[in-house]
Curated annotation (Swiss-Prot):
UniProt family annotation: Belongs to the ATP-dependent DNA ligase family.
Protein name: DNA ligase
Induction of synthesis: Expressed in the early phase of the viral replicative cycle.
Organism: Vaccinia virus (strain Western Reserve) (VACV)
Catalytic residues (positions): 231 (n6-amp-lysine intermediate)
Amino acid sequence: MTSLREFRKLCCDIYHASGYKEKSKLIRDFITDRDDKYLIIKLLLPGLDDRIYNMNDKQIIKLYSIIFKQSQEDMLQDLGYGYIGDTIRTFFKENTEIRPRDKSILTLEDVDSFLTTLSSVTKESHQIKLLTDIASVCTCNDLKCVVMLIDKDLKIKAGPRYVLNAISPNAYDVFRKSNNLKEIIENASKQNLDSISISVMTPINPMLAESCDSVNKAFKKFPSGMFAEVKYDGERVQVHKNNNEFAFFSRNMKPVLSHKVDYLKEYIPKAFKKATSIVLDSEIVLVDEHNVPLPFGSLGIHKKKEYKNSNMCLFVFDCLYFDGFDMTDIPLYERRSFLKDVMVEIPNRIVFSELTNISNESQLTDVLDDALTRKLEGLVLKDINGVYEPGKRRWLKIKRDYLNEGSMADSADLVVLGAYYGKGAKGGIMAVFLMGCYDDESGKWKTVTKCSGHDDNTLRVLQDQLTMVKINKDPKKIPEWLVVNKIYIPDFVVEDPKQSQIWEISGAEFTSSKSHTANGISIRFPRFTRIREDKTWKESTHLNDLVNLTKS
């Protein structure tokens, strides 16, 4: 059985390793001949763990300030300089209530059992007892590691691809399809990964699109032909049906709110009369009586009431699984043809996505112009012969703000990283916001632009919605995760960028700025379009996405 001390050393070695191959080799060498491979891999990937601990960084600080009898304010101030694991380690070492162990005695199994128990309680008194109990058997470094597991970020600079491909060269790709970590590890030991398929009622990583800034680029990407599909301004939904059971998952593989999808339980059996089990990729949109899509955000309970005679409508664009048959390795044109054969449209309830077979550039331009004229979001372009590759950005999306050559071809989904005090009537409140993106290579957050122009009501709401730490433009208080140049140091930084809001930012064009840290990329005349509540930081525009977006 692997000890927590061994696991901590592995994490340290992975962090200091220079690249993908070296990190994966370290993991592969470590798990070889160990019986608890699954547990090791599971804990190396805490972000994939579906256990919920009901506490963020601020709550962890609050609870441990009570346990250690330390100043909560001092602990929060220390957190502003780094991250939660270091803060807890520092104050555990200094506290006089619980003496840290001199020698590590915990196994990974002990830690995993603790995490399971912690996920089952919600009362603060119960959480305090459990956190006290685990601290009493930890060294300072042990507790730091446990807290980072609760926070679901070990900061080892190694994501799922690095870790899973240490098991087998194609384990990561298989995982994105099956989403079953235990099955992958068991089958890898038997060299039988190819047998793993989609499991109905278990979410699949959705296939994604990268931004496209020209019609010419689209034809270079798909020289053998493409489908142009309307990009619906709704919410991505993966539909699973197994006999009379249903499951609905969002783009980040979380359950969709029931009020948005409950109606589908009545209509899916009518639209797919021959299907016993099925998995669909689709978009749910609120439409009017003429099946015209209504604005994004109208799916909410209160917002929907503003639109009389409206209906929830499922626009189906792919069939991934049908009655025991995994269809993801079949070319798109065959999947689409099959979908046409097995699905019966129910007007305003379940319909096919609008799809056009494109053969030349002028046709694509016409289809794009038509979509924008109808005030639709744009187009998604798909290889006509393409297979469905879970989690991969093989499609292209065009949703232009401006049609003129050289103008910004797409908006960017950026994360709120900080804020500045406003001036004049807006003095004393956060009125200007620092927007940025995540750099997968460095594990840091980089700045892209500042954004303002919100109305008074929106600003009033944002003061409460955004969880900020006041740093008063002090360079010494810039958190470890943020890379920002001196002239853009904000008055406030977000407590946790991975929990921050994602805003769609549009502008006249992408520009070069030596002052911003996202490879010098910025946005000219940035403007806030909307909050992307349907996305997590993982689906936001990362630095590599931004670089691709600016290439013409």
